[in-house]
Amino acid sequence: MEGPIQTSYENGFFFFKIKYRSNYPFRAPILSFITKIYHPNISENGTISNCFKDWSPAVPTKAFIISIQSFLGTPFDDECLNTEAAKLYKENRNLYEDTVKEYVNKYANYSIYRNKLKEYEAEDIFKISEN
């Protein structure tokens, strides 16, 4: 997923896992980030806080992913999993934004992932043509 524009996550490319529970769509899927990310509501291991407590079975997957993008740009106070990021967000927003950008450049650099995806696609095409 691309980072939301006009945020410090812009130009980042983030991988995450979506686990659909056995009682889906009546309960929200479980989401965890694979890409390292700096955010008050996301733990160091990628666990995301319960930002989907108002889940509705009518929510399609595309809307769910869009809500994740929106969530990145607007952290909330009630369930902070990264206390350092939460404290910085409240006390020094400029330093928080700079730290997010550092993480994006180091761990979610879009140009690096774009090149990796191109290599992967090329390898898949080559494997298919061998068969």
Please give the residue ranges for each predicted region.
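Charge-rich (especially acidic), low-complexity segments
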Residues: P75-N131
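Compact alpha/beta protein-protein interaction domains typified by the UBC
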Residues: M1-A86, E130
